[in-house]
Each structure stands twice: as C-alpha cells, then as structure tokens.
C-alpha cells in the first residue's frame, strides 16, 4: 500500500493537469507521455480541441486517427471553434487537391527514337540566280582566256602588261570571282559576302579605269572585260536581298500588355518572407 501511494504521489503536475476531469485511467498509464494520456482521456471523457483537430487533420490526409471517429464527430458537433477550423482546413485541402489535379500529366519517358534530320530543301532557282551563274561562268572563261595569254585588250602601257606576275595575279583574281559567283548562285547564303567584296572591288576598279582611260593606258576592249564583274556585283546584291526575305515591320509586332498590379502591390523583387496567417493543420 505504501508503494502504491508513493507511485501515485510521484505522478507529475503536467499529467495531473491533462487528467483533470478524466475518469478511468489505468495506473499503468501514469508513466506514459502526456499526449498518450490525453488521447486516452478523449476516448472516455470530454475531448480536447487539440486532440480533435489532430484527428481531423489525419482524416483529411487519409491517415489513421488517434481517437475514434465517433468521438471526434461528437466533439465537432459541440465545438463551434473546431467546426470553423475544420471548414477552413477542408477548403484549403480541396483547393490544393484541385491545383495538383489541374497540372498536366507528363508521360513517362520511353526509349528515345533518334531520327535523321530532314534534308534541307533548296529554294528554286530564280532568274537572278541563273543570271549570276551565267556571269560567273563568263568571268571564269575570261580569266582562263587571259591566263592562256590571249588578247583581252591589254596594252603595253597598262601597268599589268609590263609584269608577268601582275598579269597572273589579275588572272587568278578574275577566275576566283567567277567561281564565287557560281557558288553564290547555287547557295544564296554566300551571296551576302560576295556582294560586299564585289561592291568594294567595283568601286576601286572604277577609279582606276577612269584614270587609265583618260591617260590612254587602257583600251575599250579591256574596259568591256570588266562588265561581268559590275553585273555580278548587282546580281549578288539582288540574290542576297531576295534570300534574306523581307524584314518584319515594327508595327506588325504586337505590344505586350502591361501587368496591372493591385493598389497595395509594388514592383520589384520581394525582400520579406511569407508567414502563415492561421495555425498549422496538424
């Protein structure tokens, strides 16, 4: 008897607070944590709101409740605060569930089917490209004729007629221009670079031709041999512009609508932290 009295006297003040008004607690539970004693009290006596909300939270999560559902429902019918809490938490849980269901379902990734990239279709040959192709062939033929030493209108007074090396350089340059013209006619993407080179070359060559023509150092036949380069420069610009396509008009791009913010909102990155305004569901 003395040992039992000693054991009963050693049970702590917190447990006695939990067991206040609770009847029928076995002596073996006196050493259990306060939460276990409180749940036991909820099954045999009036239920604490914290225990009821814990059981309701478990019900929403599909977990096993710590106390019988009948006792929870009985407490819920008597406690208006717990009813309001349960209504709010159930609404939030439904919103989260609908939000999760509205997200698109990503199908599982299977075996990656590697396919060959489709071959790039060449654009049809336009008259500009055909003309540039013909001019390039004519330029190659002109350079070849000059390379074989045939008369292409050079005079002895012309600076290139005095040196064989300068003549060879002129021949190489003429043939190279013809090859690039043919390439730009077949692949219009190369016409941009060709147009820039030929435009600069024709501008500088025109100055030399005018000076040599005034001094009588160049014949009319030699001047006519420069026409393929001039025509090629014009055609290269035309092919380049037709291949690049029309540029979009500035007014054709739709302006993005401005974001309308609430009156109490401010632009910029939020510096503070978000804190919950209600208690935890658990």
Curated annotation (Swiss-Prot):
Membrane spanning residue stretches: 130-150, 170-190, 191-211, 223-243
Cell membrane in keyword set: yes
One Gene Ontology cellular component annotation held by this UniProt entry: plasma membrane
Membrane topology: Multi-pass membrane protein
Main location group: membrane
Keywords: Cell membrane, Membrane, Transmembrane, Transmembrane helix
Pfam families membership: zf-HC2
InterPro entries linked to this entry: Znf_put
Stretches for region Disordered: 263-282
Subcellular location: Cell membrane
The protein's name: Uncharacterized protein Rv0093c
Taxonomic source organism: Mycobacterium tuberculosis (strain ATCC 25618 / H37Rv)
């Amino acid at each position: 008897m003395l040992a039992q009295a000693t054991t009963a006297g050693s049970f702590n003040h917190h447990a006695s607070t939990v067991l206040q008004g609770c009847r029928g607690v076995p002596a073996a539970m006196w050493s259990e944590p306060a939460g276990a004693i409180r749940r036991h009290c909820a099954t045999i006596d009036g239920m604490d709101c914290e225990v009821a909300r814990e059981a309701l939270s478990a019900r929403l999560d599909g977990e096993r409740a710590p106390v019988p559902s009948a006792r929870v429902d009985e407490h819920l019918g008597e406690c208006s605060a717990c009813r309001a809490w349960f209504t709010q938490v159930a609404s939030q849980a439904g919103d989260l569930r609908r939000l999760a269901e509205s997200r698109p379902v990503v199908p599982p990734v299977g075996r990656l089917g590697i396919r060959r990239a489709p071959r790039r279709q060449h654009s049809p040959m336009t008259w500009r490209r055909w003309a540039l192709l013909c001019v390039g062939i004519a330029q190659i033929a002109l350079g070849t004729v000059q390379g074989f030493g045939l008369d292409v209108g050079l005079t002895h007074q012309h600076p290139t007629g005095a040196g064989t090396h300068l003549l060879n350089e002129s021949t190489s340059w003429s043939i190279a221009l013809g090859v690039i013209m043919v390439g730009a006619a077949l692949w219009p993407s190369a016409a941009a670079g060709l147009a820039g080179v030929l435009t600069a070359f024709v501008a500088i060559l025109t100055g030399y031709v005018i000076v040599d023509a005034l001094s009588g150092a160049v014949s009319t036949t030699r001047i006519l041999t420069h026409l393929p380069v001039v025509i090629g420069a014009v055609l290269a610009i035309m092919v380049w512009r037709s291949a690049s396509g029309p540029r979009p008009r500035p007014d054709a791009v739709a302006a993005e609508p401005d974001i309308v913010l609430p009156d109490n909102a401010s632009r910029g990155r939020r510096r503070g932290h978000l804190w919950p305004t209600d208690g935890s569901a658990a």
